[in-house]
């Protein structure tokens, strides 16, 4: 049964795992002395990697996606959006070192990750699905 599978083929698991992955990054950051408060003043202009820019564009689409899903009574739009966002973040995570030696770049990347997590959490909440910090 797909709904019970803990694999990338299960869209709920895949999106929840994206949320949990960001939480894991923040646990690692805390071990390095960085917390969410440090992220608030991060310089987002440090984000120039194509994967980072794609994530930023994707995040900007969330309000419009929610609006269209509500107006058209098509909740699957939110599901598809979240799957794409989670996929983009998983790719970004696998290609880039979020917590590298450049502390200012790490802060900017954590800011991006925090916003991905915030949008995933909000989207899952709209769908009535939990957003776990660990899996």
What is the predicted role of each segment?
Residues 1-135:
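Non-catalytic interaction-recognition regions
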């Amino acid at each position: 049964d797909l709904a019970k599978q803990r694999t990338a083929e299960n869209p709920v698991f895949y999106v929840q795992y994206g949320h949990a992955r960001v939480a894991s990054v923040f646990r690692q950051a805390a071990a390095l002395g960085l917390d969410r408060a440090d992220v608030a003043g991060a310089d987002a202009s440090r984000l120039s990697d194509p994967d980072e820019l794609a994530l930023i564009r994707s995040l900007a689409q969330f309000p419009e996606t929610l609006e269209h899903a509500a107006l058209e009574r098509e909740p699957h739009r939110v599901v598809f959006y979240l799957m794409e966002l989670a996929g983009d973040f998983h790719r970004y995570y696998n290609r880039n070192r979020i917590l590298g030696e450049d502390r200012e770049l790490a802060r900017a990347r954590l800011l991006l990750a925090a916003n991905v997590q915030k949008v995933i959490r909000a989207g899952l909440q709209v769908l009535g699905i939990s957003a776990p910090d660990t899996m």
